[in-house]
Amino acid sequence: MSNNIEALEKTLPTAPMKLVAMESCKDLGQKVNDYLVSFRKDTINEITNSPLYANYKSNSYLVDCSCPRFGSGEAKGILKETIRGTDLFIMTDVCNYSLTYSVNGHLNHMSPDDHYQDLKRIISAATGKAHRINVIMPFLYESRQHKRTKRESLDCALALEELTAMGVENIITFDAHDPRVQNAIPLSGFDSFDPPYQFMKALFKAVPDLIVDKEHLMIISPDEGAMHSAV
């Protein structure tokens, strides 16, 4: 950890950081913000007066935003504070089905498509103002449609191309169905982090009496694509 801190002290920030937690990702966004506030207040104390680290330490990095809907069911993205010149990180959970909205008196649960559209609305509101735009999408939108079989659409590749065309420089996700989909955007940043280690830590913590040997434990891959995780 000390080596990481030392490396961080020698690295200049790209720009003052701001964090947008979409409605689908509010709780996780708040946890990330709380960690950032604590981490930055407890480390790198020698740089407080440097203009290169303006707004490095803050009581909150969250940006107030919303995606209100018209009576027709259409929506718009609103940033309620300036993000000009910032290194903007936008977090969204496209699989949060608990959120609802009303159209003509009918209650609708938000689908991944709805969450993706709201993400693009916020990106559109920030384009041309933020110094850099990064998207954190724990579940990669349309990641299961990463290749074409017969006459099918290439939804994941199209989504990645669309985001980068709107000005997104980096896309961060976890356990993408096939990380090779990043070939659709070879000149942009794409990171897919594998979580098996975190899964095992959580499993051992939740089941402390778990016996790990060839007689009592078997790890099975649901398909060929997940074999590397099981191994």
Task: Write out the residue ranges for each language-model feature.
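PRPP-associated nucleotide enzymes
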Residues: 1-231
